Amino acid sequence: MATVTEMPTDVVVVDDVKEVSTKSEKIIDEGIEKSSITDSKTETESRLDMHKLVAMFKKLNPLAKEFFPSYYDPKKNNQVAKANQFLPADDFETTKKQSGEEFDLDAKKDDNTRKRRNYSQGRRRLTGRISKAQREDSIRRTVYVSDIDQSVTEEGLAGLFSNCGQVVDCRICGDPHSVLRFAFVEFADDQGAHEALSLGGTMLGFYPVRVLPSKTAILPVNPTFLPRSEDEREMCTRTIYCTNIDKKVSQADVRNFFESACGEVTRLRLLGDQLHSTRIAFVEFALADSALSALNCSGMVVGSQPIRVSPSKTPVRPRITRPPSTN
């Protein structure tokens, strides 16, 4: 009779475990393989995208108009043709190599422009320092005089201070009929200004004058505007200098105001610009008495501003009429 042998159950279990393990390894290997394939595809696609991007950038023209900022004006830099011309990358490189001399010229122009700009800026700074030093020197040579009697003229005031040193300029300001008038007297050197301080309290007219060091310099008058002959000096006696004129007031309004208050106006020059809120005028009368009467108008309101009137140091010269151009 044949004998039957039974296999142990634990052996069967071990075989099943081995089989399951083998299947798991196959699945893992397949997953790794699929992942590798996916990664490879992604990397390939990324490289293709990068190549496309590089190719696209190569086709861009760096001198195209859209690459320049809004404030850049190609007309001023002779770049009109270059800014509006589109070139492929290869053609652009070829053109650049062929026109290397032209690019060098542009670089030289830019370099020269930069040098000129730096030179101009340095020159302005130097000029500014010189003018500041000159202004400070002028202030040291100037004294401020107040409480000037209405009968005192600039010539009389300069005569008083001429004993202290050479007087190079004298300017009386303020209402000519008020004791609140003041003046600036500039000397040729610091010593004259220093000695002038000792004249404080000196009776000039009916009032003692006060003399102090000035904090400002006298605004110089352009020598070309000063009278050049006796006739022009006589014109100055009939001319007044009017300031603080409302910008809304016209030249006709200024003329009508002074003619109705003082007398006939023969010439009038109304001046102004965008930087100042008010304007100035030079008014020449037919008679010197009219100019004296006009000095009383200082403080009167014309338009919406009180005007300031003082004797003029310069005549109102007639405008030069140029012949029409033949071109």
UniProtKB/Swiss-Prot annotation:
Motif Bipartite nuclear localization signal: positions: 114-125
Subcellular location: Nucleus
Feature: compositional bias, Basic residues: 114-127
Annotated region described as Disordered, given as residue ranges: 97-132, 308-327
Pfam families tied to this protein: PAM2, RRM_1
Keywords, ordered alphabetically: Nucleus, Repeat, RNA-binding
Ranges of residues in domain RRM: 141-216, 238-314
PROSITE patterns in the record: RRM (PS50102)
Protein name, per record: Polyadenylate-binding protein-interacting protein 9
CDD domains from the UniProt entry: RRM1_CID8_like (cd12459), RRM2_CID8_like (cd12460)
Predominant place of localization: nucleus
Record's signal peptide: none
A GO MF term: RNA binding
Annotated motif PAM2-like, positions: 59-69
